[in-house]
A protein has these predicted regions:
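Cysteine endopeptidase catalytic domains of the caspase/legumain-like
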Residues: 1-202
Length: 202
C-alpha cells in the first residue's frame, strides 16, 4: 500500500503513476488478468509490483495467490508466463518489481547464465532465485528499502529516481545481509519513476 501511495504522486504532490491496487485476498485468475491488462497498451511506462509468496517447483518460479494449491502444476502464476506477457508488450518501458522468495528466477532461461529480456524491460527482485525474502516488522525488508528509495534515498542531484538508482540504493543497504537483490535490464536509458525535491540545491 505504501509503494502505491509513493508511486501515485511525485514529491511535490503532482500526479505520477495511475495505480491499480490488487490487495488480498486475490485469486490467481484475477491477478493474471490484471497483469495482462497492465501491459496490453502502448504507454510510455508500465510497472508491476508484487509483494507476497514465491515458490519454485520442477517447472520454475511462481508467484503465489491464496487460492493456490501446494504442489499443483498451476500453483500461482509462473514467472516465465509473466515474462512472456512483458516481453510481448508494446509499452515502451516495462518494469517488474517482485518482493517474494525465489524472485530472482524471473527472466531466467534454461541456460542459467542468461536472461531473456526484450528491449525496454527492467526487472528488480528482492533476492536470488535460491534465496528467501526476509521480513522485518511485519513487512518485507526489500519493500521497506524500496519505499526508502522512492521517498528520496535513491534520488540523484536533480531529485529523479529511476529503477537503476533504486537497485543501487537497495543493494548498498543490504550489504550486511545475506539476502541479495537482483537487477536485470535491457534499456538504453532509465526513465524516472518519481521526482522528489533535491536534498541539495544546485
Amino acid at each position: 500500500e505504501e509503494v502505491a501511495g509513493l508511486l501515485q504522486k511525485h514529491g511535490n504532490g503532482n500526479p505520477d503513476f495511475d495505480v491499480r491496487r490488487m490487495l488480498d485476498p486475490q485469486k490467481r485468475a484475477e491477478v493474471l488478468t490484471g497483469i495482462q491488462d497492465l501491459f496490453k497498451g502502448d504507454e510510455e511506462v508500465a510497472l508491476l509490483y508484487f509483494s507476497g509468496h514465491g515458490y519454485i517447483n520442477a517447472y520454475g518460479g511462481n508467484i503465489v495467490m491464496p487460492d493456490c494449491v501446494e504442489d499443483d502444476y498451476h500453483m500461482g502464476i509462473a514467472m516465465k508466463d509473466i515474462m512472456t506477457i512483458v516481453n510481448k508488450s508494446k509499452v515502451k518501458n516495462k518494469i517488474v518489481i517482485l518482493d517474494c522468495c525465489h524472485a530472482g528466477n524471473i527472466g531466467d532461461t534454461e541456460h542459467e547464465d542468461y536472461a531473456q529480456l526484450k528491449s525496454g524491460v527492467s526487472i528488480l527482485t528482492a533476492c536470488r532465485k535460491d534465496e528467501y525474502a526476509l521480513e522485518m516488522g511485519g513487512h518485507g525488508l526489500f519493500t521497506e528499502l524500496l519505499c526508502e528509495g522512492l521517498r528520496g534515498g535513491a534520488a540523484d542531484f536533480n531529485g529523479n529516481i529511476s529503477i537503476g538508482s533504486v537497485y543501487a540504493y537497495i543493494d548498498k543497504s543490504l550489504d550486511c545481509w545475506t539476502q541479495r537483490p537482483i537487477f536485470k535490464t535491457n534499456v538504453s536509458e532509465f526513465v524516472s519513476l518519481r521526482n522528489v525535491i533535491p536534498k541539495v540545491s544546485i
